[in-house]
Amino acid sequence: MSNNNSAIVSKVWAFCNTLRDDGVGYGDYLEQLTYLLFLKMAHEYSLPPHNRNLNIPKEYTWESLLQYSGEALEVHYSLMLRELGKSKGILGQIFAKSQNKIQDPAKLYKLIKMIDAEQWVMMGVKDKGDIYEGLLEKNAEDTKSGAGQYFTPRPLIKAMVACINPEPSKTIGDPACGTGGFFLAAYD
């Protein structure tokens, strides 16, 4: 994992610990992080050079979140999740039954600003996978979490993928896929 990715993992994990003190569990935090990252990346894809239209209603875009703070932010984010969950197609599936689990508006604002500071689309698939895997690994190492999850060390993954030598026309599988580390290494 690169130093920049490690720094992002540390920053995001530290914030997770802050929220856990407020009763927000790791799973809820990861869920909220995923919703916010999706919205941020959709915003990035809407800008040049991508210029993609992901059909997110203007009042529920990433930019709309940045316009609020305090209790108004918490109200807007909760409404946004509910309304996006009613959307047709994949957008509705992503946000189905979504709820705001971060009840402290100041902490929600801080999380949004932290996500906004990064250019997520510019990161490679491997970098985003490393960050996600790093968060899961930190959760498993945390004695308070009791996650009971196990992670294959990166050097072992690399060695196994080198032995298998996957090619574009071959099918691979990972029946115990937790973090997707084997798939990311094979993709690489």
Where are these regions (language model features)?
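Conserved class I S-adenosyl-L-methionine
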Residues: 169-176
